[in-house]
Every structure is written in structure tokens, then in C-alpha cells.
Amino acid sequence: MTMTAGRLEAIWIKRAHRGPMDPVQEAQLDPARGLIGSVDRSRRRQVTLLEAERWAGLMRELHAEVDPRARRANLLVSGVSLYQTRGGVLQIGSVQLVIGGETTPCERMDEALPGLRARMGNAWAGGAFAQIRASGAVRVGDPIIWV
């Protein structure tokens, strides 16, 4: 993992199961409560991340243009690779996240675009899930580094 700075490109909160991913400019993350306002409250998967570059690559491969919010991740990041980073600590603004593993794409990916689920099953293309180590606010545009 390098110290190259990335950027937080988007934040989405899911307020209801199977509900839309609502874009926000800022969100609060808390180790005890997860992503504040999000219906997902798993202790293991408190927040999910997707690489903007990987998503764009998938869209090129599939000759499609699907909004990355279709992935249903909470944070869209650029400039940092999530590939095989389990156990790594990512800092976004003042918030620290511990990468727990690769997210597994569900059938909803094929609802968004036929064939997307299979393509996302390779090399962490579906993103990563994390636990919140240090709480605080994250904002679109925040710098991202590995610590």
C-alpha cells in the first residue's frame, strides 16, 4: 500500500432496505453506529467502498454506462486501490476505516446491467467493506490515504 492520496468522489446513504442510494455531500461515521442514517448496521460491514476507476473499467468492458450508485456502495473513492487490502487502514479526512474484505456482488447487479455481477466477481471489482475505527465526518472531496 502506498501513501498516494486519493479522493472521496461520492457518498450514498441507503435509508431503507432495497431503497434508493441517496447522495449526500457529508456523512457521519461512528464505530458503534456505523454510517449514520443508513439502514445497514452490521458490525462487520459498517461501510462499503467502490473504486471509481474499477467501475469505469467495468463499464468500458461491458460497453455500458451505469451510474456507480447502482453498485449500492456507500463511498466512491478514486486514486486508491482496494485490491487485496484486507486489514489495511484507510483514512478519509479524519475518519479511519479498517478494510474487512471484498464485497460480493448480489443479483441486483444483473438487474442494473446483465452480466455485471459475473464481471464484478474478479479481483475486488465489487469493492470492499470496512469497519469504522475512528469516528467523524467525511465530505465529498476529502483526501484519502493509507495509514
Across the structure, where does each feature detected by a protein language model lie?
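Metal-cofactor-dependent catalytic cores
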Residues: 1-147
